[in-house]
């Protein structure tokens, strides 16, 4: 069995989709004001004095707490449709080639899974989330050709709480989540693709690792 595990932001895309999604969903003015408000926290994060996942949680909560999940999902789908140009052609070629060979493809991303999944509609025949998201019938739950492992959002009474329902899928959490889906490590060949510090553990786990691929 062959598994190809792709990081999303920076590996398959040319930009960080959290930043782009907030700008798309909230508008440039609200985006700039929100990040200005959190500037001290972001500086501390860059200096490794404040945890990445906490900064991400606070920023996400600032922009999306209280939004209906239906509206959020619609924004996710529309964002992906409007931003397919962010996907690197070489990454798409590698992903399609793996699928066409019958290999298993997994996207392992720190980004919110609800906006990652729609980027791949029309690229893979069937797409699933490791969290079994209640998306439309265009994302069947059986015989996945492509699975998305990402950070999931928490909801209450149909609205975003501003918190995440899973750990931030970053660093060692990427390995933990991948092995939870495919625990029999000795029985498959793993090829991994990543571009940042958050992918180190995933790349170290792989039989074959590609660091910062698809740049040419």
Regions found by a protein language model. Give the residues of each.
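Helix-loop "lid/cap" segments that line or gate small-molecule binding pockets
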Residues: 43-48, 55-64
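Acidic catalytic patch
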Residues: 65-74
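Alpha-helix C-capping/helix-to-loop hinge sites
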Residues: 24, 28, 78-83
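A general alpha-helix detector
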Residues: 20-21, 55-59, 75
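Active-site neighborhood of HAD-like aspartate-dependent phosphohydrolases
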Residues: 1-48
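Electropositive phosphate-/nucleotide-binding environments in soluble metabolic enzymes
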Residues: 12-15, 50, 66, 172-175
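Conserved alpha/beta cores of soluble small-molecule-handling proteins
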Residues: 2, 28-31, 47-49, 70, ...
């Amino acid at each position: 069995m062959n598994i190809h595990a792709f990081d999303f932001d920076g590996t398959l895309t040319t930009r960080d989709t959290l930043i782009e999604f907030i700008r798309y969903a909230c508008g440039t003015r609200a985006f700039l004001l929100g990040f200005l408000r959190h500037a001290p926290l972001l500086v501390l994060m860059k200096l490794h004095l404040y945890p990445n996942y906490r900064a991400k949680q606070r920023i996400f909560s600032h922009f999306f707490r209280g939004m209906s999940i239906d509206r959020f999902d619609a924004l996710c789908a529309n964002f992906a449709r409007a931003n397919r140009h962010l996907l690197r052609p070489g990454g798409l070629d590698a992903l399609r080639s793996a699928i066409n060979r019958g290999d298993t493809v997994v996207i392992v991303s720190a980004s919110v899974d609800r906006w990652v999944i729609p980027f791949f509609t029309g690229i893979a025949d069937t797409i699933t989330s490791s969290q079994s998201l209640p998306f439309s019938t265009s994302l069947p739950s059986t015989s996945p050709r492509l699975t998305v492992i990402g950070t999931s959002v928490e909801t209450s009474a149909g609205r975003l709480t501003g918190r995440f329902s899973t750990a931030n899928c970053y660093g060692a959490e990427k390995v933990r989540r991948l092995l939870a889906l495919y625990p029999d490590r000795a029985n498959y060949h793993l090829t991994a693709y990543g571009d940042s510090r958050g992918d180190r553990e995933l790349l170290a786990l792989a039989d074959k690792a590609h660091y910062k691929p698809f740049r040419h």
